Curated annotation (Swiss-Prot):
One of its GO terms (molecular function) is ATP binding. Homotetramer. GO terms for biological process: CTP biosynthetic process; GTP biosynthetic process; UTP biosynthetic process. It comes from Francisella philomiragia subsp. philomiragia (strain ATCC 25017 / CCUG 19701 / FSC 153 / O#319-036). Its main location: cytoplasm. This is Nucleoside diphosphate kinase. The active site is at H117 (pros-phosphohistidine intermediate). It is an enzyme of class 2 (transferase). Belongs to the NDK family. GO terms for cellular component: cytoplasm. The keyword Transport does not apply. ATP binds at K11, F59, R87, T93, R104, N114. It catalyses: a 2'-deoxyribonucleoside 5'-diphosphate + ATP = a 2'-deoxyribonucleoside 5'-triphosphate + ADP; a ribonucleoside 5'-diphosphate + ATP = a ribonucleoside 5'-triphosphate + ADP. Gene3D superfamilies: Nucleoside diphosphate kinase-like domain. The gene is ndk.
Length: 140
């Protein structure tokens, strides 16, 4: 057993489509437990800070603008191999390349409006969780 926590963000496009419950159902069906959650409309500074690792990439400005275009649902997921499990549920970054039945294949519109974000490694998961949640906000 490798119990982990990972950060997940349901992005503005998916929140707009009113599919938060469907995405949560997929988390829970795969054995992931939501141990913290909040809905938030990110400020530009929050989005820039969260995605600072990409600040020199050509897509940075568009990503920030997209992430502040509407509310997001941010959650901490916990479970065995939570990081890999969540990434498998999400599917490839580009929904056209995502396996059928993944969140992105089913709900994402484009590589930019791709429905969800998930941490990619234990180190980034820890940093991303701390960015949005204090220890007392996480149950379990």
């Amino acid at each position: 057993m490798n119990k982990q926590r990972t950060l997940s963000i349901i992005k503005p496009d998916a929140v707009e489509k009113n599919i938060i419950g469907e995405i949560y159902r997929r988390f829970e069906k795969s054995g992931l437990k939501v141990v913290a959650a909040k809905m938030k409309h990110l400020s530009k500074a929050e989005a820039e800070g969260f995605y600072a690792v990409h600040k020199d990439r050509p897509f940075f400005s568009a990503l920030v603008e997209f992430m502040i275009s509407g509310p997001v649902m941010i959650q901490v997921l916990e479970g065995d191999n939570a990081i890999a499990k969540n990434r498998k549920l999400m599917g490839a970054t580009n929904p056209k390349e995502a396996e059928a039945g993944t969140i992105r294949a089913d709900f994402a519109d484009s590589i930019d409006a791709n429905a969800v974000h998930g941490s990619d490694a234990p180190e980034t998961a820890a940093q991303e969780i701390k960015y949005f949640f204090s220890d007392i906000e996480i149950v379990g």
